[in-house]
Amino acid sequence: MPPHRSRRRKRASATQLYQTCKASGTCPPDVIPKIEGRTWADQILKWGSTGVFFGGLGIGTGAGSGGRTGYVPIGTRPPVVAEPGPAIRPPVVVDTIGPTDPSVISLLEESAVIDSSIPVPTDTSHGGFNITSSASGPSSTPAVLDISPPTNTIRVASTTSHNPVYSDPFTLRPSLPVEGNGRLLTSHPTIAPHSYEEIPMDTFVVSTDTSNTVTSTPIPGPRPTMRLGLYTRVTQQRPVATTTFLTSPERLVTYDNPAYEGPAEGTLEFEHPTIHEAPDSDFMDIIALHRPVLSARQGTVRVSRIGQRASLQTRSGARIGSRVHFFHDISPITRPSEAIELQPLGSSSTAVSTTASSAINDGLFDVYVDPDIPPSHALPPLRSPTHVSTVSLTSLGSVPAQTANTTVPLSLPTNINVGPDLSPPESPPFISTRPVSPSFDSVMVLGWDFILHPSYMWRKRRKPVPYFFADVRVAA
């Protein structure tokens, strides 16, 4: 098997080499003479043409056509073709002017004399003014012109014909029902029903609000929650400790200008000179502060603004910089460290005792809830048409202590029968066998009107971060 030979690459033409290597001076020695016509063959033709001329014989290296005039027999002349020249115009005869001829030449030719005795026709159909003139001598009275317009009679012609295809629109409208003498009178159109198809209309917008009238204007839905992108990798985070950021954020970017009254709630734009220094170093090169945003973040109420830096500026005027998130925490949202205990109405270090008494007309009955207090220790009965609820607190021991009473007036409906005085069964006092140290209060709650402590409620695993916008959206 013969060995594999590499394929020979074709060399670039002399014209291509001349275009690339002429400026750099790296051309091969045979390229420049060939392109510029300085080879030995070109020199011999140049020197030989000075002594010998073969132009009339048509000898050359062309296609063999015999030159411009072609091949002709020897001893004859080629035909002569007349070339087109300028068009020949006829000469213009110029009349000579003698010394007796007038210097002013009339442009109009002479015509015959017009006879003015021919009457001029008058057209009176145009409806204008009729002017009558009369010739008079120098001693006669001036002429009187009659300028009153002639009376034109207007003629109106009308033709009436019956068209069976046309129907009066009045007959197409059905009359409204009329009620008279307890009867409902209704009339129907006498025209036959139409032959076209009725297409039902679809309701594109459905409103659940029945108080307002549905119109043709579409009802916009709720706006989707905007993602501000405050906490991204490309946004720098800069906390601001001063409260000036809430009222006058422009004072942190530039120095105070008394004549400037810009919108504190909108987008603030700044123009800085070439060399400047901001009052706050965190606000260096800031050219725009966008609208504020309220949000709840990590248990605090936070005010945020997006700032745009202009760290670089190109020759075309474009500014390049990063985005900065400036935020200030207004107040923390902290949870109480310990539970809040509800205090009773009558404050004392004793147990709860409730006495209710009521009297309707002449009847009265008392209810003693605390069995430790006999009826003799209760308040005397009150003869009044309203309830009196008494709350007294006693200690847990066997001996009742002083009571702190709170009187609350109550009322009962009148349809409840009044019964006799009732007293719950009494039991011997409880004596503890072990010392109580320290002593604590006990509250007995009988009822269902209580509030569950928030710590016993279910907690969500993920707490959402709601956003509250100052003006709905943030300018980009």
UniProtKB/Swiss-Prot annotation:
Spell out the disulfide connections.
C21-C27
Q: Keyword annotations for this protein? A: Capsid protein, Cytoplasmic inwards viral transport, Disulfide bond, DNA-binding, Host endosome, Host Golgi apparatus, Host nucleus, Host-virus interaction, Late protein, Microtubular inwards viral transport, Phosphoprotein, Viral penetration into host nucleus, Virion, Virus entry into host cell
- What parts of the sequence cross the membrane? none
Q: Which GO terms describe its molecular function?
A: DNA binding; structural molecule activity
Q: What is its main location?
A: virion
- Location within or outside the cell: Virion; Host nucleus; Host early endosome; Host Golgi apparatus
One Pfam family linked to the record: Late_protein_L2
- Give the record's GO biological process terms: microtubule-dependent intracellular transport of viral material towards nucleus; symbiont entry into host cell; viral penetration into host nucleus
In chain numbering, motif Nuclear localization signal lies across 1-12, 458-465
GO cellular component terms given for this protein: host cell; host cell endosome; host cell Golgi apparatus; host cell nucleus; viral capsid
Q: How is it modified after translation?
A: Highly phosphorylated.
Q: What is the protein's quaternary organization?
A: Interacts with major capsid protein L1. Interacts with E2; this interaction inhibits E2 transcriptional activity but not the DNA replication function E2. Interacts with host GADD45GIP1. Interacts with host HSPA8; this interaction is required for L2 nuclear translocation. Interacts with host importins KPNB2 and KPNB3. Forms a complex with importin alpha2-beta1 heterodimers via interaction with the importin alpha2 adapter. Interacts with host DYNLT1; this interaction is essential for virus intracellular transport during entry.
Role according to the record:
Minor protein of the capsid that localizes along the inner surface of the virion, within the central cavities beneath the L1 pentamers. Plays a role in capsid stabilization through interaction with the major capsid protein L1. Once the virion enters the host cell, L2 escorts the genomic DNA into the nucleus by promoting escape from the endosomal compartments and traffic through the host Golgi network.
Please report which protein family the annotation says this sequence is part of: Belongs to the papillomaviridae L2 protein family.
| Name of the protein | Minor capsid protein L2
Q: Which organism is it from?
A: Human papillomavirus type 32
Q: What gene, per UniProt, encodes this protein?
A: L2
